[in-house]
């Protein structure tokens, strides 16, 4: 089940703070183009964001990162579940949109596998449009992808 929240944050200030973490080459994971920071610790998360997430999500923040997609950048289908033995219980993942200056900046698609006990390849994905201050929470074993950003501006 996907939970959809709208937070009330000063996004301009938050974006400035988060851009301080964009100071290295980042890492290559599911991102095809664009930038993904290295993993960051909970202590690094700006308090205004962490406090509002804590109000919405029952759980402990373990790690987070900054993702920036420019024109044509996308994220391939992936999940966040760690299957390395010993296998852990399924956790919670989320995405928070800070900067969404245009339309057509790449919807996030959640695959239908988590919606039914017997999914098929033909299950249509659940589609969510990026919007500023939108927080989406989902199980960490839920496969998801991001469509290409069709704008000349960056989405964060």
PLM regions: where:
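Non-heme Fe(II)/2-oxoglutarate
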Residues: 1-62, 72-75, 107
């Amino acid at each position: 089940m996907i939970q959809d929240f709208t937070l009330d944050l000063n996004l301009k200030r938050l974006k400035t703070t988060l851009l301080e973490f964009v100071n290295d080459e980042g890492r290559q994971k599911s991102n095809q183009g664009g930038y993904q920071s290295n993993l960051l610790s909970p202590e690094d998360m700006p308090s205004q964001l962490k406090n509002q997430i804590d109000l919405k999500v029952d759980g402990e923040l373990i790690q987070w990162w900054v993702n920036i997609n420019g024109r044509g950048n996308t994220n391939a289908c992936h999940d966040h579940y760690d299957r390395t033995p010993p296998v852990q219980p399924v956790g919670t993942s989320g995405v928070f949109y800070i900067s969404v200056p245009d339309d057509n900046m790449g919807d996030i698609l959640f695959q239908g596998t988590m919606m039914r006990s017997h999914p098929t390849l033909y299950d249509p994905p659940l589609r969510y449009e990026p919007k500023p201050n939108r927080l989406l929470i989902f199980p960490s074993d839920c496969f998801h992808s991001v469509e290409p950003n069709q704008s000349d501006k960056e989405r964060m």
